[in-house]
């Protein structure tokens, strides 16, 4: 919400592509962190714990081979970490004496952070503590993080106390006394968390835990485990660490003044533009401003005022206009009284699931690439200029033989995303 219009209900901040790579392409925070983890010499086995709504987007940005542990519903960090730990042990076959390092995917970090993660894992493997936390040296009195009060100022020390997210004045006092940010980065042996989990939850293994997940108490890992653990170590980290959760912090991390088609004249000062549309944005005479455009909407704001956007976004009541899926993406082009027009892009080798609709007809027009459609069990090849009609009730899917662009027109009095019945013969992905 705070990064509207780039983020929305199904696309959170970690998926926004604003970081320019050496090849000129842009990547998101999750792509950046995932790439950093893959470069580690330890050859870590990486699994992403996430909600069901984010799986397609993760596969779109990281590939379909990435390991994902899916929460059936949101139950806070303790159940999520226990579920992921059980997944690593029971599904992936990782031994109880192996170490897991937990870290968020959305901070802005540099290469020294990934080196620090390896050190964190090595400390946990050494067995000097049941939990090893990364304490981040604060750069300002943040109200967004909890704080760790270490027992000393050594690179690795014990933990004296843990503090909840404070107000700015209290945070200043914590920092004066040597407190560190608690960024939610820690390491442990799988057996330790599984043992703690069995003390608090009645379950037999991953499958049983997954079935009972919706009944679990909503409780944080800090409260359930960290604050009660006496054998704990804190490893200091003094490198770059930023939460890019506001337009101010996001634009500070941008390597250039604009992303996407935009022009700024010489009178602009401290202005950043992120444009996901195909039409250009021209800025003249602006100061301390952020301009952002996406299919979801357009924001023009003073940077300081951009933090107060939430109540205005809540009033827009606009449907999701763009989404990335494991098979590609779609963008809403036009919303009519009895029609919805969408541009669909499928990656080579990908396909929609085999499905039907009861209250709408659909028409596909291929505008780029080659593919294969299946209509009520009958398959045929399609290419540029081909039109496929699908009346309500017929089962249909389309597979991309090359990258495929299709204009989809939905026709009906009551067009609803829930009007969809999956059938055997297609992929398991949500279209």
Across the structure, where does each feature detected by a protein language model lie?
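Conserved N-terminal catalytic core of the sugar/cofactor nucleotidyltransferase
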Residues: 5-9, 19-104, 108-115
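Catalytic metal- and UDP-sugar-binding loop of GT-A-like glycosyltransferases, i.e.
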Residues: 103, 366, 409
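A structural signal for isolated positions on well-ordered beta-strands in alpha/beta enzyme cores
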Residues: 45-47, 101, 132-133, 233, ...
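Conserved core of the sugar-phosphate nucleotidyltransferase
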Residues: 110-216, 233
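Residue-level signal for inorganic ion chemistry
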Residues: 15, 30, 84, 106, ...
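Short N-terminal binding/cap micro-motifs at the start of the first secondary-structure element
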Residues: 1-5, 417
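C-terminal structural segments of small proteins and small subunits
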Residues: 407-415
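Left-handed beta-helix
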Residues: 188-388, 394-397, 415, 420-430
């Amino acid at each position: 919400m705070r990064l509207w219009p780039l983020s929305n209900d199904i696309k959170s901040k970690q998926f926004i592509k604003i970081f320019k790579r050496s090849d000129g392409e842009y990547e998101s925070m999750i792509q950046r962190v995932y790439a950093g983890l893959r470069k580690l010499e330890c050859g870590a086995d990486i699994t992403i714990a996430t909600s069901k709504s984010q799986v397609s987007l993760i596969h779109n940005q990281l590939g379909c081979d990435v390991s994902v542990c899916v929460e059936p519903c949101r139950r806070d960090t303790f159940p999520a970490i226990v579920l992921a730990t059980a997944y690593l042990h029971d599904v992936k076959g990782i031994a109880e004496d192996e170490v897991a390092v937990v870290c968020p995917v959305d901070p802005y970090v540099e290469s020294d952070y990934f080196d620090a993660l390896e050190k964190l894992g090595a400390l946990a493997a050494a067995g000097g503590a049941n939990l090893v936390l990364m304490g981040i040296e604060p750069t300002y009195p943040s109200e967004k993080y909890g704080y760790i009060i270490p027992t000393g100022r050594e690179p690795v020390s014990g933990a004296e106390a843990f503090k909840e997210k404070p107000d700015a004045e209290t945070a200043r006092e914590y920092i004066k006394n040597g407190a560190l940010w608690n960024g939610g980065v820690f390491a442990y042996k799988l057996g330790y968390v599984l043992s703690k989990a069995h003390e608090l939850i009645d379950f037999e293994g991953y499958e049983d835990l997954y079935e009972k997940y919706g009944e679990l108490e909503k409780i944080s890992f800090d409260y359930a485990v960290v604050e009660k653990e006496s054998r704990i170590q804190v490893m200091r980290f003094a490198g770059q660490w930023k939460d890019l959760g506001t337009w101010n912090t996001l634009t500070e991390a941008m390597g250039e003044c604009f992303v996407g088609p935009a022009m700024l004249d010489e009178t602009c000062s401290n202005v950043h533009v992120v444009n996901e549309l195909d039409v250009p944005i021209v800025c003249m005479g602006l100061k301390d401003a952020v301009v952002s455009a996406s299919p979801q909407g357009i924001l023009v704001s003073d940077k300081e005022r951009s933090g107060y956007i939430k109540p205005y976004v809540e009033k827009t009541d606009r449907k999701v206009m763009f989404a990335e899926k494991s098979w590609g993406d779609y963008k809403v082009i036009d919303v009519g009284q009895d029609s919805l027009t969408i541009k669909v892009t499928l990656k080579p080798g990908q396909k929609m699931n085999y499905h039907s609709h009861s209250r709408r007809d659909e028409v596909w027009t291929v505008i780029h690439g080659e593919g294969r459609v299946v209509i009520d069990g009958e398959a045929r090849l399609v290419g540029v200029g081909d039109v496929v009609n699908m009346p309500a009730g017929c089962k249909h899917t389309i597979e991309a033989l090359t990258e495929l662009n299709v204009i989809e027109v939905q026709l009906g009095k009551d067009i609803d995303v829930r009007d969809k019945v999956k059938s055997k013969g297609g992929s398991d992905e949500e279209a």
